[in-house]
Amino acid sequence: MSIDTQSIIENNKRSAHDTGSPEVQVALLTARIELLTKHFKIHKKDHHSRRGLLQMVNRRRSLLDYLNKKDNERYKLLIEKLGLRR
C-alpha cells in the first residue's frame, strides 16, 4: 500500500509545475489519511500513528479553511472532486 504521488499531483495541479498549491496539498493529505485509516482497521492499538493521523486531518482542515477564505469556488470544486464532507 503506497500513494501514487505523481498522479495525485497531476490530477490536482493548477499549472504545469504546480506541486504546492492548496489543492495539491489537500489531495496528498487526503490520500495519506485514507491509507492510514485502512491501516487502523487492522492495527487498532497503533496509538503512535494515530497521533500523526490527527495532525494530518488538522493540517488538511487548515488548508481547506484557507482555500475557502481565498477562493470559495476552488474550495467547492476540490471538496466535490475528493468526496469530502463539509
UniProtKB/Swiss-Prot annotation:
Residues 1-21 are annotated as: Disordered. CDD domains: Ribosomal_S15p_S13e. GO terms for biological process: translation. Keywords: Ribonucleoprotein, Ribosomal protein, RNA-binding, rRNA-binding. Residues 1-10 have a biased composition (Polar residues). It comes from the Bacteria. Transmembrane segments: none annotated. One of its GO terms (molecular function) is structural constituent of ribosome. InterPro entries: Ribosomal_uS15, Ribosomal_uS15_bac-type, uS15_NS1_RNA-bd_sf. GO terms for cellular component: cytosolic small ribosomal subunit. HAMAP family: Ribosomal_uS15_B (MF_01343_B). One of the primary rRNA binding proteins, it binds directly to 16S rRNA where it helps nucleate assembly of the platform of the 30S subunit by binding and bridging several RNA helices of the 16S rRNA. Forms an intersubunit bridge (bridge B4) with the 23S rRNA of the 50S subunit in the ribosome. Belongs to the universal ribosomal protein uS15 family. This is Small ribosomal subunit protein uS15. It comes from Xylella fastidiosa (strain M12). The lineage of its organism: Bacteria, Pseudomonadati, Pseudomonadota, Gammaproteobacteria, Lysobacterales.
